[in-house]
Amino acid sequence: MKILIASNTAWYLWKFRLSLAQALRAAGHEVVAVAPRDGYAPKLAEAGIRFVDVPMDNAGTSPARDLLFLFRLLRLLRREQPGVYLGYTIKPNVYGGMACRWLGIPSIHNVSGLGTAFMKKGALSRIACLLYRTGLGRATRVFFQNNEDRSEFVGLGLVPATVTAVLPGSGVDLDRFAPRAGPSREDPGPVRFILFARLIWDKGIGEYVAAARQLQREGLAAKFQLAGFLEVKNRTAVSRTDVDSWVREGVVDYLGETDDVRSWMAQADCVVLPSYREGTPRSLLEAASMAKPVIAADAPGCRNAVKDGVSGFL
């Protein structure tokens, strides 16, 4: 069977869905990765996954650009004639679902978090509901990463309950993210906190910096580190100016970006994620796999990854 796997970035497919794509290929299926081309498209090709570039305006709200993306998906699906479409991230879910509905192609979607549009009620949330209802209303199956997100979608009438299921997260390779033997680092030094995330305000970056500033004022011997993609295409992106200002102030250290967080996580004493809302956060699963305590917001998704008072604190 030919299976199309679509996302808003090739990076996402390489980072989170490569093992799935390889398992499907090993089972005898033909797998096609669909996303806008970025620096990770060649990595997918090197792994044996055929990549198709479908440009899209990932974070924009232009109806014209979104209609163009829908047209590109329709054209691709007609040409490829897949047996099933797997959709990840917002626009490939919404517009991929619409295209599959019109062409009679089975579609399976993974809603990994509800995002900014569902945090505040208003025009944006009403438009998001309309798009999701149209895109996912006839889906073959829709997976959510926590029960709260599933209940909200079903309660709003966006998807029938009968096609929904909860798949708690993307999973973690326990062999790759294994606890390190011995001390976490050579020098005891101050306590090290680290936050791994795309640098957007919804991840609680502002709260993390404010907490770091307050604890430093109180005299706590600690280092506060940030790691993740900066200047992402998102309405709530943290600016480089803000990060540079915090670094100059001495409140946080910005480590940059990496494809492998294990060495940084191994050096940390505690992993922090004060996010406003998540599906099931991968960084907390990876931290738990490496036996690192965590501090997370008592918010949808985060609370599913932490046993309060045992593996960390909410």
Residue locations for each model-derived region?
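Glycosyltransferase donor-sugar binding loop
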Residues: 35-39, 196, 223-238
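Donor nucleotide-sugar binding/catalytic pocket of nucleotide-sugar-dependent glycosyltransferases
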Residues: 52, 133-180
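Nucleotide-sugar donor phosphate/pyrophosphate-binding loop at the beta->alpha transition
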Residues: 14-16, 64-71, 106-108, 116-138
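Aromatic "clamp/platform" in nucleotide-sugar-dependent glycosyltransferases that forms part
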Residues: 257, 276
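Short hydrophobic beta-strand element within catalytic cores of glycosyltransferases
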Residues: 293-296, 306
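Conserved donor-binding/catalytic core segment of Leloir-type glycosyltransferases
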Residues: 183-203, 208-213, 225
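A short alpha->beta transition loop at the rim of the catalytic pocket in nucleotide-sugar-dependent
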Residues: 262, 269, 291
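Short His-centered aromatic/hydrophobic patch
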Residues: 87-93, 111
